[in-house]
Amino acid sequence: MVPFWTVVTDQHIKYTSHNKAGFIIDEEQHHWPPSSGSSLGRAPSIPLSSSNPRSPIRPSTPSRVSTDWTRPPAPSVAYEARDINGSPRLEPHHHNMEEVLEGLCHRAALFGQGGCGRNDNPNARAGVGKRCLCRSLLDNAGQRPKGKLEIGTFVHDCLDLYGRWCHYQSEVESLWPSAGRKTRYARPSRSTNDQEGGYVDQWRADSRMYIPTILHSFLPRRDEREFTHMRYTAVTCDPDDFVVKGYKLRQNIGPTMRETELFICVTMYNEDEIEFTRTMHGIMRNIAHFCSRTRSRTWGKDGWQKIVVCVIADGRQKVHPRTLNALAAMGVYQDGIAKNVVNQKEVTAHVYEYTTQVSLDETLKFKGAEKGIVPCQMIFCLKEKNKKKLNSHRWFFNAFGRALIPNVCILLDVGTKPDSKALYHLWKAFDQNSNVAGAAGEIKADKGKGWLGLLNPLVASQNFEYKISNILDKPLESVFGYITVLPGALSAYRYHALQNDPSGHGPLSQYFKGETLHGRDADVFTANMYLAEDRILCWELVAKRDEQWVLKFVKSAYGETDVPDTVPEFISQRRRWLNGAFFAAVYALVHFKQIWRTDHSLTRKILLHIEFIYQFISLLFTFFSLANFYLTFYFVAGSLADPTIDPFGHNIGKYIFVILRYVCVLLICLQFILSLGNRPQGEEIVSEYHGDVFHHHGIHDLCLRVYCHQATYDARSRKDRPQQSYKLGNNIFTNLIVSSVSTIGLFFLMSFLYLDPWHMFTSSAQYFALLPSYICTLQVYAFCNTHDVTWGTKGDNVMHTDLGAAKAIGSGNTVEVEMPSEQLDIDSAYDVALRNLRDRVEVPKPPVSENQLQEDYYKSVRTYVVASYMVCNAILAMAVSEAYPVGSHIGSNFYLTFILWSVAALALFRAIGSSAFGVINIVSAIAEGRIQAKFERIFGGGDERGRHRAGLGSGFSESGKTGITSGSGMSGMSLSDVTSKISEKLAG
């Protein structure tokens, strides 16, 4: 049998010297240039002599081919470094030789060496048609040698078996388990000094985590460590201290040290694998599109190296098990690694890092390079506790963002399926304009296969609502430069714009303020405002001192998302949206003076003030929407009581009006009672909410019929009596026509202008039928639950053990409990009870808990809010109805005229802003196209030589257009600079 310490492969040979402990003294890393004949991911080999065939029993030793080959000089390093790459070295351990060799053979098989001898098949596995090397070394007449082996000596002499030289001590540590552990995941927790002189308590398993063998077998690339190893880090600090404590990501260390241009955040709670894969596969398709832009300065074939995807799960006990299975299938996650405590410190998050080359689509089928999938750098952060979405964003921005310093950050929710070019269009908005701090994509409702989801009126109404918002509201706000909300489901931010000033005040500090609000210090106004914390972030960006950031709507970047399809889920979602939007709008209006301290131009400030006026009017209409709904119904249906226009005759219209009026009032009162006392998720209350919705359907449908009858009758009466003057705005027919045309008509017009009119034919009827429910049910429920500032994902799951426990014994039919067994114990307890009754000992009252104080405070404020809301709407409704009683001529009703014409004016204002958005985009596209064509004609195109001739360097955008920023987000040349350059060139 060949002595073990002389075993080498037929691929390489390396000589090392050792210290007394048997550990490697050589710290120098030798890197040979790759040879054409080497396999993917292997170091080049020294040529072997063909006259020395390999023995079938043991591997041969390489022969010297040329005489000019010299032995590498002995290293001069006396001792090993204390750590490698920020991770501490292990102390020398001793292991059973059989375990070591079996682990070595497994690793040799994993990297294509077949486990014994040379195997030309790079995907070969151990034990397939050949005798395993570890058995060849151990078997000697049926006997196995006993004894121990120093790890360092063995590995650096024999690690070539899997085709790559190990130049790091961490590789040595990763070949076998640590003492006392039989798995391949082990790595002890150590403390190492960081750059600040403190200590870093980390459990790093970077070198330990091989990817599964099956996954490794079909990977197209196995030439880098990031493709063959998964890195795990147990984080024991707060996300704000991630960088300070010395934690690093793969993009900060070693050969994977790279700059990050695009950082994508995917937040999830308990979504299943279908929702996760539809989002993740959409991201992978977007990354493939980035890599397909070969003419880009920023992107190209290796563009994936500038993109990092971070998936953050909110709570280890909350994440869906099948979602973890999907991540494991991609190689990003491995079970059995994570620990709760490291160095007596509680772990706050488990961070897994891997560069995956496969993707799972919605049908859970693998997609790889054959389908255009490119590598994707992934970070999976599994939070130990459920601390809500805001905390997940703090991990993203303050922990991983500070480590990577990206240019653009994109936020996605699990369940959102981005279009294949959506992320590129979002990034492009920042590349073309250095003043853009945030961008919003278009959110579309998932209509299901074959649009069958529209058969549900709730889904159809939300589809219409989303479409109108993306056609009228978002373009209008984008023209002014301030979008009230960038949806967390699909939005992007410039990382530099989010940073706080030296004093610590800025967008991110205000954004994360809502996470630290506790107890009575968290007033109801602030707590509800931070239910829509993304609105606060938008405002802080636009109003940032001494800056001129703007927000932009990118209609070409769209993604589909699931919408609630049940009434309880829909009501709960809108409760959070409505309360957050209302209080955030109040916050922005109260602090509008911050705009004066910005560096915006005078024109921009004027536009922003116009938008504030528009938002103030919209806020008033929202607050008094309940009274306006009742008054509109009161006057339109009350016109039936006028005998001169009663379409039914015999005072039937009056009786119908009285019945409908009482039903409407009773339903509104019932809505307040239900909102104050019940949850939508309650089984008994669901039917009541459905009944409420259907009652409103009937009322609204009848109102529409009444309107049609009255409009027709009024028009006929005007035709029969031409002697009466027909003044615009002086009759109900004109008011109703103008109001209807300004809403429904403009909806149709703008939808056709944006070439997206299908929702008007498939979803408009459902929306208008559900409109009373939007006003009454949703708005009332939101104001009646201002005390509820949760996201509905947090509960008390802690089990108290102060009463002890009962343990089952035997077959499980009997339990064992601790009971007072001595008679003395029983008598003393009885004596204490009698003495307390006789002396009337005062029982101390337990102090009120902080949670109870907070709940009482929130509910008391809720009472004031609901009372104010009810009183204000009731006063308005009663005052106007008394001023214009039933039977009075409806044409002289000035309040109804004001309401209807205000609706028309607001709709027209939205249409003008939306049209301006379209015109600006068209003009910008034409201007950019002409400048690009002139640039290519003068300077020879957008290639590197043409840019050098122009002297523009990196001032142009990635496609050669007049981008204002470079790929790294630094400010470049303005349009005037480009124009002057062209003029100088022409003049020369």
Curated annotation (Swiss-Prot):
Alphabetical keyword list: Cell membrane, Cell wall biogenesis/degradation, Glycosyltransferase, Membrane, Transferase, Transmembrane, Transmembrane helix
Membrane topology note: Multi-pass membrane protein
Catalyzed reactions: [(1->4)-N-acetyl-beta-D-glucosaminyl](n) + UDP-N-acetyl-alpha-D-glucosamine = [(1->4)-N-acetyl-beta-D-glucosaminyl](n+1) + UDP + H(+)
Renumbered residue ranges of the record's region Disordered: 29-75, 950-988
Record carries keyword Protease: no
Compartment(s) where it occurs, according to its Swiss-Prot or TrEMBL record: Cell membrane
Presence of the UniProt keyword Kinase in the record: no
Enzyme class name: transferase
Transmembrane segments annotated in the record for this chain: 577-596, 616-636, 656-676, 732-752, 764-784, 864-884, 911-931
Function recorded in the entry: Polymerizes chitin, a structural polymer of the cell wall and septum, by transferring the sugar moiety of UDP-GlcNAc to the non-reducing end of the growing chitin polymer. CHS1 mainly responsible for normal yeast cell reproductive growth.
Protein name: Chitin synthase 1
